[in-house]
Amino acid sequence: GGILNQQINQSSIKLIIACFLFSIIFANNPLRINNNRLNKHLSELSKFGKNEFGGVSRVAYSDADLSGREFAIKLMKTAGMDVHIDPGGNIIGILAGKNNDLPPIAIGSHIDSVPEGGNFDGNVGSISAIEVAQTLKESKHTLNHPLIVVIFQNEEGGLFGSKVMTSGLTELELELQSSSGYSIRKGVERIGGNIDQLEKA
């Protein structure tokens, strides 16, 4: 938790940052992600909360959100990451580096959606970050720094996952109702967070 507080100061770390870092790290020995696998995982994720219009309603704390999170966790573990849920309900995957005392490289995004949302906002950043880790594992390439993949919870409902890591949540914010009908407090507990330990996120 503490190490993330020092490294993450934005609401969501987008795919473009992941691609930029990846291109720099492997400029002299380029690795290639598996495009087919990436698209397959994006398609599979889009099934959770899929609506009749071709989009998705995977609002935070809903059953569809929980299923999508389980799917993402499965992919992260397959990619060789040590995965846990922080007290704020964010999914954290860690791929060890050669020197884990070095500051981590953090990438990721979110997978919750607005009601009647699209299939790519947030999803691309999250699934692409996992694909980066999978590519590193398959290539047997270990970074000097640890790599952290973060999937922030409830980004669409008010950036609550990233707020937990930066400024924290007030009692008033914890009682706000989300689009799924759960309060933020109940929602965080529903996805495996721990309200009493938020300061450790």
What would you call each of these model-derived segments?
Residues Q10-A18:
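Sec-dependent signal peptide recognition
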Residues V114, N123-A201:
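Acidic/histidine-rich catalytic neighborhood of metal-dependent amide-processing enzymes
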Residues V83-P87, I107-S109, V149-I151:
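General beta-strand structural signal in soluble alpha/beta enzymes
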Residues A27-V56, A96:
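N-terminal hydrophobic or amphipathic helices/low-complexity stretches enriched
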Residues T78-A79, I91-V124, A129:
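Catalytic-core environment of secreted peptidases
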Residues G1-Q10:
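N-terminal secretory signal peptides that target proteins for export/translocation
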Residues C19-A27:
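Hydrophobic h-region of N-terminal signal peptides that target proteins for export
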